[in-house]
Amino acid sequence: FNAGGHINHSLFWQNLAPASSNEAK
C-alpha cells in the first residue's frame, strides 16, 4: 500500500514548494 507515502509526499512537497519554489525552478 503506497497511499500513506503519497499523502506524506504531497504534504511534504506543499510545505517545501513555497520555500523552494524559486530554487526548484
From Swiss-Prot:
Mn(2+) binds at H9. InterPro entries: Mn/Fe_SOD_N_sf. Its EC number is 1.15.1.1. It catalyses: 2 superoxide + 2 H(+) = H2O2 + O2. Gene3D superfamilies: Fe,Mn superoxide dismutase (SOD) domain (1.10.287.990). Binds 1 Mn(2+) ion per subunit. It comes from the Eukaryota. It is an enzyme of class 1 (oxidoreductase). The keyword Translocase does not apply. Keywords: Allergen, Antioxidant, Manganese, Metal-binding, Mitochondrion, Oxidoreductase. One of its GO terms (molecular function) is superoxide dismutase activity. One of its GO terms (cellular component) is mitochondrial matrix. It is found in: Mitochondrion matrix. Its cofactor is Mn(2+). On the 2D-gel the determined pI of this protein is: 7, its MW is: 24 kDa. Destroys superoxide anion radicals which are normally produced within the cells and which are toxic to biological systems. Belongs to the iron/manganese superoxide dismutase family. Homotetramer. This is Superoxide dismutase [Mn], mitochondrial. It comes from Alternaria alternata (Alternaria rot fungus).
